[in-house]
Structure formats: structure tokens, C-alpha cells
UniProtKB/Swiss-Prot annotation:
Keywords, ordered alphabetically: Actin-binding, Cytoplasm, Myogenesis, Nucleus, Ribosome biogenesis, RNA-binding, rRNA processing
Organism, scientific name: Takifugu rubripes (Japanese pufferfish)
Function: Binds to mRNA in a sequence-independent manner. May play a role in regulation of pre-mRNA splicing or in the assembly of rRNA into ribosomal subunits. May be involved in mRNA transport. May be involved in epigenetic regulation of muscle differentiation through regulation of activity of the histone-lysine N-methyltransferase KMT5B.
GO cellular component, one term: Cajal body
Family according to the record: Belongs to the FRG1 family.
Sample GO molecular function, one term: actin filament binding
Protein name: Protein FRG1
Length: 255
């Protein structure tokens, strides 16, 4: 366990990565953005885009409509492709257990945890979570791969097994993690409601949130808001707001 905890969060090392051509036309950019934002959902199973979304039951899609399939022998293979509107079969569904802010464990329908053996073969025969049963989903540039405890990415071998043998992530190591968990509708920027709008409206929002209304009057700092605009650009917006509120001596969280 100690050896594995030393492994740092990983970025994808892509094989033969090429930079895409830039589209100067605004309409083309807008079209590409719209396509990127279109949810990838198959039979109620949607693609996970970040670690935060790793919840509940998941399926690992390694090719179009083909998922990692658990065998009763404790081994895994790539299942037969499904129809475009068809989700994964029960042997292709796994339970997610979050172990940290970056690592998970996966439990098959046979009640065993996915891990790797000394040869890098993915197996599901353990009834407990040890160092070999820990996985790190790696997200980068809209792509995703799954890192095993041996610091290798999983892929599908010529012999029909699921293995973790590659230190770099190429097309064969790319996969999609799909989940059937209920989706949370969030705004694209994921900003708090108090942080929306211009700097003055944001300041009013925070004053309403934190001010002690002893005489039921809203006290807002009348100083120049240009300092707030600069602070927002510099990433010190909340510090600046707190400083302005503290000068008004009306915030129960300030001096």
C-alpha cells in the first residue's frame, strides 16, 4: 500500500499525438463546441467526463459499443458489440468505490474486486481491496484511460484478455467509462450563484449572504469597484470582497 500511495496523479502520455488544425471561422468554432457539449448517452448510460462523476454502477467501453466483460473464471475479455441504443449487459457492469480524490476500486457482479496480477493481467478474484485493486481514471483533452497499480494503462490484448502493460496511452488504451447514475444538471462554468454577474452585483450578493442586518439596512462599500475587477482577473476576488466588507464592520465573519 505504501508503495502505491507514492504514485502521483497521472497525465496521459499520448502516442503520436498531433495538434488539430485551427478553425478561424466563428461558425465552425461554434459548431464544434456544440458537438462537444452534446451528451454521449447510450441506453441511459452516459459518459463520465471527470472524477467527480464517478459514482454508482459503471461500464468500461473499450471500442464502439463493446464493453469489458467479466467471466466466471475471474478473468475479463471484450464483450460482443451492442446495438447503438443498447446499454451494457450485467457482466459488463461494475460497482464504483471511491478510495481517494483520484483513485477508485471496481467490483464485478461476481462480488470480486478488479485488480492485476504480477504479469499485468486484469483479474477479478479478490474479496478485499489491496494495492493491486486500486485504479486511477486519467482524463485529459477530452480523452480517458484507466491506470492500474503497476502504472500501466489497460487495453485489450490479441489473446482476448484485458491487460495493463503500456506505460503510454495510445488509441488502444483509450476507453469510455459510462454510468447509469442520475445526472446532476449543472451550469457549464459551475459557478456559485453569488459569483454570477458583474463585480458590483456579486458584492451585493455576498453582502446579503454575510451581513448582520441589525437595522435592516444593506451596507455596501462605496469605494471604487475597479479594485474588484482587477482582483477578479488576478484570482483574488473573494479576498477583495472580504476586505471591503471588513472595512464596513458589518460582517459577522470579519474582524
Amino acid at each position: 500500500m505504501a508503495e502505491y500511495t507514492k504514485v502521483k496523479s497521472t497525465k496521459l502520455v499520448l502516442k503520436g499525438q498531433k495538434q488539430g488544425k485551427k478553425h478561424k471561422h466563428k461558425d465552425r468554432k461554434r459548431k464544434a463546441t456544440d458537438e462537444d457539449e452534446k451528451p454521449d448517452i447510450v441506453g441511459g448510460w452516459w459518459v463520465v467526463k471527470s472524477f467527480v462523476e464517478m459514482n454508482g454502477t459503471v461500464a468500461l467501453e473499450m471500442q464502439n459499443n463493446a464493453y469489458i466483460h467479466a467471466l466466471d473464471s475471474g478473468l475479463f475479455t471484450l464483450g460482443a458489440p451492442h446495438k447503438d441504443d443498447e446499454g451494457p449487459d450485467p457482466p459488463e457492469q461494475f460497482t464504483t468505490i471511491k478510495l481517494s480524490d483520484s483513485r477508485i476500486a471496481l467490483k464485478s457482479g461476481y462480488g470480486r474486486y478488479l485488480g492485476i496480477n504480477s504479469e499485468g493481467l486484469v483479474v477479478g478474484r479478490s474479496d478485499a481491496i489491496g494495492p493491486r485493486e486500486q485504479w486511477e481514471p486519467v482524463f485529459q483533452d477530452g480523452k480517458m484511460a484507466l491506470l492500474a497499480a503497476n502504472s500501466c494503462f489497460i487495453s485489450y490484448s490479441d489473446s482476448g484478455d484485458i491487460v495493463a502493460n503500456s506505460k503510454t496511452a495510445g488509441d488502444e488504451e483509450m476507453l469510455k467509462i459510462r454510468t447509469s447514475a442520475e445526472r446532476e444538471t449543472r451550469s457549464k462554468d459551475d459557478l456559485a450563484e453569488e459569483d454570477r454577474g458583474n463585480v458590483k452585483s456579486c458584492e451585493v450578493n455576498y453582502v446579503k449572504k454575510f451581513q448582520s442586518f441589525q437595522d435592516r439596512r444593506l451596507r455596501v462599500n462605496e469605494g471604487d469597484s475597479m479594485t474588484l475587477k482587477k482582483a477578479r482577473t488576478d484570482g483574488k476576488f473573494h479576498e477583495a470582497l472580504l476586505d471591503r466588507r471588513s472595512k464596513m464592520k458589518a460582517d459577522r465573519y470579519c474582524k
